Amino acid sequence: MIIGIGTDIIEISRIERAIQRTNTFIERSFTCNEIAYFKLKGFKGNVVAGNFAAKEAISKAIGTGFRGFGLKDIEILRNELGKPIVNLSDKIYNLLEIKEFNMHVSISHSNENAIAYAVMEAI
């Protein structure tokens, strides 16, 4: 049963400006594992923006927005085929009434925008 959905779209140039403007944007927003993935991909703006949009979409699917947790409490990695894999911190699980669920995420981008869609499914 679907218990939450969320979507987010962001301009890739906005994320690129944030990366150029401050060294701390990446460190404040992403986990060490995500940063390692970005490094592997050459810190491309569309990759970073896609992960950022996914975090926003997940916060909306959860139904709280970023209340009680931060960006680094959501980790977006990839499996060997490139499918996004979501890891949530204990802080998020402690906020939720439902404890057993799957989080599905799709990330895409054009030349200008990145978009992510999240579906929270009860098990």
UniProtKB/Swiss-Prot annotation:
Superkingdom assignment: Bacteria
InterPro entries (UniProt xref): 4-PPantetheinyl_Trfase_dom, 4-PPantetheinyl_Trfase_dom_sf, ACPS, Ppantetheine-prot_Trfase_dom
Pfam family, one: ACPS
Record keyword Lipid metabolism present: yes
Gene3D superfamilies: 4'-phosphopantetheinyl transferase domain (3.90.470.20)
GO biological processes: fatty acid biosynthetic process
Residues annotated to bind Mg(2+): D8, E56
Keyword Metal-binding attached: yes
A GO-annotated cellular component: cytoplasm
Subcellular location as annotated: Cytoplasm
Catalyzed reaction equations: apo-[ACP] + CoA = holo-[ACP] + adenosine 3',5'-bisphosphate + H(+)
Its EC number(s): 2.7.8.7
Keywords: Cytoplasm, Fatty acid biosynthesis, Fatty acid metabolism, Lipid biosynthesis, Lipid metabolism, Magnesium, Metal-binding, Transferase
GO molecular function terms attached to this record: holo-[acyl-carrier-protein] synthase activity; magnesium ion binding
Cofactor(s) this protein requires: Mg(2+)
Signal sequence bounds: none
Class of the enzyme per the UniProt entry, highest EC level: transferase
Summary of the function given for this chain in its UniProt record: Transfers the 4'-phosphopantetheine moiety from coenzyme A to a Ser of acyl-carrier-protein.
Family according to the record: Belongs to the P-Pant transferase superfamily. AcpS family.
Protein name from the UniProt record: Holo-[acyl-carrier-protein] synthase
Organism: Clostridium beijerinckii (strain ATCC 51743 / NCIMB 8052)
